[in-house]
Amino acid sequence: QLRRKGYQVAIYDRYDRAGGLLMYGIPNFKLEKDVVTRRIERLEQAGVQFQLNTDIGKKLPLAKLRKQHNAILIATGVYKARAMAAPGAGLQGIVPALSYLTVSNRVCLGEKVKAFDDGSMNAKGKNVVVIGGGDTAMDCVRTAVRQHAKSVTCLYRRDRENMPGSLREVGHAEEEGVVFSWLAAPKAFQGDKSVTAVRSIRMRLSSQDGSGRQAPEEVVGSEFNLPADLVIMALGFDPEDLNGAFGESDLAISKWGTLTIDQRTMMTSLPGVFAAGDIVRGASLVVWAIKDGRDAAEAMHTYLEAGAQVARTAAE
C-alpha cells in the first residue's frame, strides 16, 4: 500500500528469504511456498527493496536505521519459544516447534538440511509426541504424519472444548491418524542421551483461572509413559528482549514484553517508529497481521503527509 502511494519502501529481514512465518512457519500443505514466492516477486517488481540476512539491532542498529528512513514499521512478530522446566528437558530429540517447522519448510523448498538428513528434525519412523494445543501444535502433528512417523500423539493439558487451536485442524489431524491425549501433561522426559519417553500425568479441570479458563490440575497417582523418539515443544511464543535487541532504551515495552503503541496512530514511543502485528498484540493469526499491516500503512502515510505539509509551509 505504501508503494502504491509513491513511497520508496525497504524491507529488512533477518532470514535468507523474505516472508517470515508465511515462508518458514506455516507448512507447505497449508500454504504452498510458490504462492508466497510469487507475492514477493510482485513486490520486487513494484519496486520494494528487500534487505535479507539483516538482523536489526545486531547487524544494523535501529538508531542508524531511523536516520536513513523517514518512517519505520516494526513487524518482527514473536519468535521466542516458551520453554518447559522439567527433568530431562535437555535430552536430544526434544526440539522447538518453529525450528522443526522451519527445517521441514526448507526441505520443501529444495534445500539440503543437515538436521533433516541426520534425523534430528525428521519424524520418519519415530514415535512423535507434540506438546501443546494451539495451531502451531496442529501444524507439527500434521507435518510429522507427512514425514511418515511411526506414531503421532498430541499431549494437551485441557480438553477438546478448551483447546486454543482450530477444531477443524484437530479434525483433520484425527483423520490423518494423530492421537490426542486430552487432559494430560508432561512431568519429565526419560532417556539417557536421547529421549525415549514422556512421563505424563492425567489432569482435570477445576475452577476458572485468571484468564477466565478452567485451570488444569493433576490427578494424583495417574502418571503414565508415552514412548517418544522425537518430542516437539509447541507451547507458544513470547517476544524477545526488544530493548536489548534494538538498543533503544526509550522504546516503550508492555508488561507482556510486546511493543506499546498509540492505538490511534500506531506509533511507538519513538517518533516515526510504528509497530504492528504479533509484536504488538502477541501471538495471533495471519489475518490479524494483515489487517494491522494495512492499518499501519495508512497511519504511516498520514504521518508522512503531515511532515511533508509542514516542510511545504516552512518553504513558503
Regions found by a protein language model. Give the residues of each.
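Beta1-alpha1 glycine-rich phosphate/pyrophosphate-binding loop at the start
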Residues: 1-56, 82-87, 99, 137-183, ...
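Rossmann-like NAD(P)H-binding beta-loop-alpha module
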Residues: 1-5, 110-149
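Feature captures the FAD/FMN-dependent oxidoreductase FAD-binding
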Residues: 37-86, 188-199, 206, 228-232, ...
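A conserved FAD-binding loop/helix module that cradles the flavin
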Residues: 140, 276-311
